[in-house]
Amino acid sequence: MSAEPRVRVSAILRWKGRVLLCRHEKPGKEYWLLPGGGVNGGESLVDALHRELAEEIGIDDQLPVEGPVAIVDSIAPQRSFAPKHVVHIIFAGDLGGRSLEAVTSKDAAVRGHSLFALGELDGVILHPPIQRFLSRWQPGDPAVYLGSLWAP
């Protein structure tokens, strides 16, 4: 397999015991991601995260972030039609008094948003599949490498 790794930053954003996820679609398939996206050349991880949060959920100010709190490799299996390798660098955002009920997106790839209770994540198709980590993570926890996790 020969796939150049792509770096993706994202943020765990919790509000009233729930976590915000962005809905994406591929033909015949719906899946969810933490808000975030790709890092451009010459852009710091935190700058990329702030840019992506503005695009995907409309938070235009410099949201305070913790982390990174986790790193995940998503490497497509050898038998996959297209080689793919994404390195996910996950931060956590401090929303302060902001509400996530009126989230808006400027990104055409985002088909919607939803707040999920941490106990509801098991039935969600999440890329990468980090439901267990999200349900256990607490602010101040040490950063962890979650290994190679792939969700087709």
Model-flagged regions — what are they?
Residues 39-64, 72-126:
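Unchanged
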Residues 4-6, 12, 21, 82, ...:
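Intrinsically disordered, low-complexity sequence elements enriched in Ser/Thr/Gly/Pro
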Residues 1-34, 46, 61, 95:
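N-terminal strand-loop-strand
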Residues 29-32, 105-152:
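Nudix hydrolase/Nudix homology domain
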